[in-house]
Amino acid sequence: MAPAPATTSSSKRSKKRKQPVAPPPESDSESEELSYDTAAADEEEGEEEAPNQMEELEEEQEEEKKEKKQKKEMSKEKKRKKEKGNEGGSGILTNMLFSELGVSEPTARAIREMNYTYLTQIQARSIPHLLNGKDVMGAAKTGSGKTLAFLIPAIEMLHHAHFMPRNGTGVVVVCPTRELAIQTHNVAKELMKYHSQTLGYIIGGNGRRGEADQLAKGVNLLVATPGRLLDHLQNTKGFIYRRLKCLIIDEADRLLEQNFEEDMKQIFKRLPLNRQTVLFSATQTEQVKEFAKLSFEKNEESTSKPVYVGVDDAETNATVEGLQQGYCVIDSARRFLVLYAFLKKKQNKKVMVFFSSCNSVKFHAELLNFLQIECSDIHGKQKQQKRTTTFFNFCKAEKGILLCTNVAARGLDIPDVDFIVQYDPPDEPKDYIHRVGRTARGEKGKGEALLFLLPQELKFLIYLKAAKISLTELVFNENKVPNLQSHLENIVGENYFLNQSAKEAYRSYILAYDSHSMKDIFDVHNLNLKDVAASFCFKNPPKVNIDLESSASKHRRKMRKVDGGRRHGISAANPYGRKGGDDKRQFARF
């Protein structure tokens, strides 16, 4: 109670100092105060009540100012709510305020400091169910606010259950990639700023012993990748998880794509069945539905069924409104020249460029930096510390160029990305959606996306259109594309390390192209290898070991493992893959 008067008096003094520069409407009353104060100083000793009257007058004026300020703020808030109501919710936001959720004060305070006011569609439709302890399966576009949708109820559950470190882990969040796990942990850290509960993350690439020590001390909210979580469940004796209350699975479709299904089955067997389960996925496929059945398994006496929330089923576009999308048709031989010209012009912007292989990312990063176009790179062959540092540096940067593989295509919230360039086309439409989802995120988010296509790949646009993705053709001015081919060939030919890197990138590009699931479009035998070699700065195709038969066999084994031998089932009528036999809808959505 003691600090309150001190704060009040200090605010009074500061306001008195600011009075001489107050706005005109208040200057009249201010001059009256000053003249009254001067007159009071000249009064006789018999008029001792004047100072008290002056203090009372000041207090009345302060109260009037506060009331006016409060009324002004209330009117502004009402106006904003009215505008929201007239618009029916702008973009992904609704008219529902976070202050209406009724969460605990520590959580509410953290949300205010994170400057969140209105809930998104997925948050408004899922958080109330989750706060009531329901199981939820959610589907929403990337960048729609799914992370807050599952973290806020989870933190509230820990708070009301009075979880302490000695109680062990109460919430587990499973993420498909290390970067997404770290990012989710950082969001949870902000939300739990005023809570007493503990949190941590365990991911591949980090020291296992340090993680085991952390788990033994008690981690109430744990973010993990599947492989490392299963490792600790099997081998870490000090890991207390018998009181687990909630399991959250983020980006379930990506988990399945990365063949984590068997790991997840083993995780389900070890975790308590009497728990709340939350599953979020950007796309809904038959495989995700089957996986959901395993995820929501309960004890026999449990009769509750999960609540299904799909917020974009009626949308006419599979991508967000603020995204401008285009494609350009370029021969293999000129692909890099066009990319170079584009990036040179956009060096003051924030750009992400997607490639099909780690070696291709590595080579192009080395070459572009050699050509004085500064860029960073992220791919799966890097050590975790390098990936993490690069990722957070790019997040903080106002401008920059990041070259990456699909490791950066899902879930990551990178602020203010201006351009997404898909130098190598994605494997299928849903991968396209997730790549472009790195830009135009959140309410009123804006960004641009550019897809490079070879002339024989134009049929891919039919599949994109079937997936509710419309692109505009862009034509590059040939006069603005520099004629550097011979110069680039000399650079790569004379630099041993660049030459070796280029050979590996060339080989990986061909193998990645051969592994495309949509072989009616991406047929490796239709490639002009001399032109492909030119895009990697070779005059003639280099001598590299390319065993396409082995690569094809590996791809067939992968398909048998992923889809029970039925292959992908992708077609123009069903760009998301095979559906169940009784499913008559074009898209398997909830």
UniProtKB/Swiss-Prot annotation:
Motif (DEAD box): 250-253
Location of region: Disordered: 1-92, 551-590
Entry-linked Gene3D superfamilies: P-loop containing nucleotide triphosphate hydrolases
Domain Helicase ATP-binding: 127-302
Positions occupied by motif Q motif: 96-124
PROSITE patterns: DEAD_ATP_HELICASE, HELICASE_ATP_BIND_1, HELICASE_CTER, Q_MOTIF
Keyword hit for Nucleotide-binding: yes
Entry keyword set: ATP-binding, Coiled coil, Helicase, Hydrolase, Nucleotide-binding, RNA-binding
SMART domains on file: DEXDc (SM00487), DUF4217 (SM01178), HELICc (SM00490)
A GO CC term attached to the entry: nucleolus
Chain residues that bind ATP: A140, K141, T142, G143, S144, G145, K146, T147
Single Gene Ontology BP annotation: maturation of LSU-rRNA from tricistronic rRNA transcript (SSU-rRNA, 5.8S rRNA, LSU-rRNA)
Coiled coil: 40-87
Acidic residues: compositionally biased ranges: 27-62
Domain Helicase C-terminal: 335-488
EC number: 3.6.4.13
Biased composition (Basic and acidic residues): 63-76, 579-590
First-level EC class: hydrolase
Domain notes: The Q motif is unique to and characteristic of the DEAD box family of RNA helicases and controls ATP binding and hydrolysis.
Family of this protein: Belongs to the DEAD box helicase family. DDX18/HAS1 subfamily.
UniProt name for this protein: DEAD-box ATP-dependent RNA helicase 27
